[in-house]
Regions:
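Nuclease and nuclease-like effector domains acting on nucleic acids or nucleotide cofactors
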Residues: 2-194, 198-233
Length: 233
């Protein structure tokens, strides 16, 4: 992200805003929008008159994209959890949570989120599954970005196919030991893994399904669609 000089944050925000309407990647535009959002968050807390003035100076599409970004922060766990740690950014499941046992079986009953709403799934990421998909966000339509499986044109399917070369030895070993076909999709489902599009619109990884379901989050697909809807790609 781009650091702001607080003495001239309004000028910096408006300069960053211009970059949203230039020829840049979805991932870069997401990073720029986040820089603006975080600075506006700070001004809202510390200097409301300056915030109000700056918010009015932004273009309508920028304001709507920011509004959508703030809404995307909302789907985080709220029931049977405690928010702990610095800034209360770590979500810890209580034993009363209905999915506590499943997450405990994955050795993952708490998750830390960053200021962008991104969950740290590094401990439950299957080794070798992380792939760069930033180009897919740029070239695919919104329809194919949000499509969930069942189509070779969808982001989810194209992205997961990029994992196969790195994971092939693991899949071969699993097929040999279980007598199952040497198939990525069967292997993935047998291990209860699901794709997770990282918040930054740059990468995808495989994580364990219970964790992905329980620790709700702001994902790359929603962020990319927000960017494409308001600023193109």
């Amino acid at each position: 992200m781009f650091p702001f000089d607080r003495k001239d944050s309004a000028a910096m925000v408006l300069d960053r805003e211009k970059q949203l309407y230039s020829s840049r990647s979805v991932a870069d535009k997401f990073a720029i929008l986040e820089t603006i959002r975080l600075e506006l968050d700070r001004l809202y807390r510390e200097d409301r008159p300056r915030y109000d003035e700056l918010e009015k100076a932004l273009r309508p599409a920028t304001r709507q994209a920011l509004e959508d970004s703030w809404k995307l922060w909302n789907p985080v766990p709220k029931s049977h959890v405690d928010w702990v740690g610095p800034g209360e950014m770590t979500c810890r499941l209580r034993p009363t949570h209905p999915d506590f046992a499943e997450c405990a079986a994955c050795n993952f009953t708490q998750c830390t989120y960053d200021e962008h709403g991104s969950p740290d799934f590094s401990k439950v990421t299957f080794p070798g599954s992380v792939v760069d998909i930033s180009d897919l966000y740029d070239r695919l339509s919104v329809e194919n970005i949000q499509k969930r499986g069942g189509s070779a044109a969808s982001l989810q399917e194209l992205a997961q196919m990029r994992m196969v070369p790195e994971l092939q030895p693991v899949i071969k070993k699993w097929a040999r030991e279980t007598g199952n076909p040497e198939d990525f999709w069967e292997w993935r489902n047998a291990l209860n893994l699901v794709p997770h599009e990282d918040t930054d619109c740059r990468t995808m990884r495989l994580v364990y399904r219970p964790v992905h379901v329980v620790f709700k989050h702001r994902g790359g697909v929603a962020n990319a669609i927000n960017i494409k809807n308001h600023f193109g790609a």
